[in-house]
Amino acid sequence: MSETTRLRIAIQKSGRLSKESQKLLKSCGVKFNVNEQRLIAHSDNMPIDLLRVRDDDIPGLVMDGVVDLGIIGENVLEEEQIERNSLGKPAECIKLRELDFGACRLSLAVPTEFNYQDASSLEGLRIATSYPNLLRRYMQEKGINYRDCMLKGSVEVAPRAGLSDGICDLVSTGATLEANGLYETEVIYRSMACIIQSTQSQPDDKQALINKILSRINGVVRAKESKYILLHAPTETLEQIVALLPGAENPTVLPLNDDTNRVAIHAVSTEDLFWDTMEQLTQLGASSILVMPIEKMMG
């Protein structure tokens, strides 16, 4: 693959998605070393360049075809698409899949002393946010007039500083809101990290590499959601035990040496194996129960 056809992937330079994005790519076998002073990191073993940029630059870089792939929060993607549509700029990209990190919600919040009934309680008030387009869309759908206060950061301090009556900001646990005397009132958007692709046509070798990376990402995500289960089971309760294994597909059943009344079961479960399930397995005579994480899956 020539220099001009190297796969370019944009990831967040710093912030809540940065480390998880790097971890995901390394789990997919992409080797690279990040120099905090440099924008670009070159892969050591694949024709891939990582561009480390601000998260709100990633959607535009993908939509304009500057990079081929981007890992971004859905909230940032949606905000940029609304903005670009309003300006008549290219706003198309291909969302390849959601990822298993970066979960958050964009919510309205008000001071604890505020008498909030519903969203109409914010009629005519000033709301601070870093997501004016998502907020505007929500408030228009509700038929609520408001004044916005655009901030790039530290949105949660706006009411206390006298800049706004309420806020619209990302929430993960709510601890930051509580620390600033606020409480969450409405969730207006739920978000996960996702991987997006440019709509520009790709050379065959580059598209093949994209497909390979996506296949590996699918395998990594599936592995995180799955567990490898091993146990010994009495033959007389075998069917009941298999039925208890959550999400198991065609478990492998093997005979045990010198024990015709028991078998070994190996299974991949796509759901969590909870303690109560393990206790039920034990009650049915299962023993030597092992539940192990899976690093990678394919096929």
UniProtKB/Swiss-Prot annotation:
Its EC number is 2.4.2.17. Pathway: Amino-acid biosynthesis; L-histidine biosynthesis; L-histidine from 5-phospho-alpha-D-ribose 1-diphosphate: step 1/9. Its main location: cytoplasm. Keywords: Amino-acid biosynthesis, ATP-binding, Cytoplasm, Glycosyltransferase, Histidine biosynthesis, Magnesium, Metal-binding, Nucleotide-binding, Transferase. Gene3D superfamilies: 3.30.70.120, Periplasmic binding protein-like II. One of its GO terms (cellular component) is cytoplasm. Coiled coil: none annotated. InterPro entries: ATP-PRT_HisG_long, ATP_PRibTrfase_cat, ATP_PRibTrfase_CS, ATP_PRibTrfase_HisG, HisG_C, N-reg_PII-like_a/b, N-reg_PII/ATP_PRibTrfase_C. Feedback inhibited by histidine. Catalyzes the condensation of ATP and 5-phosphoribose 1-diphosphate to form N'-(5'-phosphoribosyl)-ATP (PR-ATP). Has a crucial role in the pathway because the rate of histidine biosynthesis seems to be controlled primarily by regulation of HisG enzymatic activity. This is ATP phosphoribosyltransferase. It comes from Shewanella halifaxensis (strain HAW-EB4). The gene is hisG.
